[in-house]
Amino acid sequence: MLLTLRVQGARHWLKSTRCLASSAAPAKSPSSPPQLEVSGSTYATDGWTNVTPKILSYVGANKHLQTDHPLSIIRQRIVNYFYGAYRNQRGNPLFSVYDQMNPVVTVQQNFDNLLIPADHVSRQKSDCYYINQQHLLRAHTTAHQVELISGGLDNFLVVGEVYRRDEIDSTHYPVFHQADAVRLVTKDKLFERNPGLELFEETWSGTLADPKLILPSSKFMDQTKQPCHTLEAVKLMEHEMKHVLVGLTKDLFGPRIKYRWVDTYFPFTQPSWELEIYFKDNWLEVLGCGIMRHEILQRSGVHQSIGYAFGVGLERLAMVLFDIPDIRLFWSNDSGFLSQFSEKDLHNLPKYKPISHYPQCTNDLSFWLPQDIEVDAGFSPNDFYDLVRSVAGDMVEQISLVDKFKHPKTGKSSVCFRIVYRHMERTLTQAEVNEIHKQIASASVDSFNVQIR
């Protein structure tokens, strides 16, 4: 979520403008144990299991709750803003906050409940960390929406870590943090000053079977409104949502920040927008939001309300507000890093001062893929990135696929990855890097049946 962060376009919410594809589950890896224990529960593994011990080690770290941590500071700023923006008649905050929810969710919670198509690329093993075919580490905190709405909540924030298989560089990490919010209102509340107006069109039947309600999950969906809602209801809800989110943005970035709204598509909201700010001569995406799809509310047992939702990445905000250059720093326990931040004054956001600049070490790794296997057709670079993380941990700063080659005679494909090593807290020797590099090469042979060039 970032000047370079811009390429991350939707770390806060699942994007749906990527190509649709399907992926069959391969046989279970021989390295997977028969069972995994995560967050106090035991799960049987199967052919979908791809979560690694390295990734599981992050579960329960709760960096967003760690005192004097930059992510905790951003979390508190967001929570405090919503506490102030919405209060009941007694002056108490309307929004409740859930920041320790179990990150293990079902496929239904993460995808089906949010109307994400069955063939959407975000469901693939190459994108998510699956515990088994029915359970995964949540890819977004939006996964808890139906659960909380079904429990009777109508104004809430969910904050926590989310997990995505991704590339390796200074702005991508397999675990990051999101804040998600939902606000629902009834007709009486929305039209308090205009009691003659309605939430829903007279022609709408109010059932899930209504073909006017069930729309294909397409980025060409009507950006004006959903068929069930009246235009008046949508416009009032849109106005409130945008007013509140612009207020949040100004609270974080200052009252004179330049901003703009951009139409977009999310499977779970319609219409949908992204909020961008003009920062250091670039437009920077800050958050995604929209009017909640009414199908989601109906599945939650709510039939007479309209709502908005938004999602934002905490790292995205913190990297900009604190001038933190590398996303790995959020996982550092170095006192030289952590001592720079304090929760005593949440509105005094210090700029990060580098502890030291350690040199990079760069090594290339080239290998032949097995016969009839190609990149993104049997071999996913994300699988290689996970392997590297498991072997080298945070000593790897960046990986890039720098070359692909198909032999004209044998038909075999070759790839070359450039791996940049740099520790955040000390200097790495070339000999140390070479040893780690050998371990990565050996693990690649064992895991992918490749031939090192």
Swiss-Prot record:
It catalyses: tRNA(Phe) + L-phenylalanine + ATP = L-phenylalanyl-tRNA(Phe) + AMP + diphosphate + H(+). GO terms for cellular component: cytoplasm; mitochondrial matrix; mitochondrion. It holds the Pfam family tRNA-synt_2d. The keyword Nucleotide-binding applies. Residues 1-27 form a transit peptide. Its EC number is 6.1.1.20. Is responsible for the charging of tRNA(Phe) with phenylalanine in mitochondrial translation. This is Probable phenylalanine--tRNA ligase, mitochondrial. It comes from Drosophila melanogaster (Fruit fly). The gene is PheRS-m.
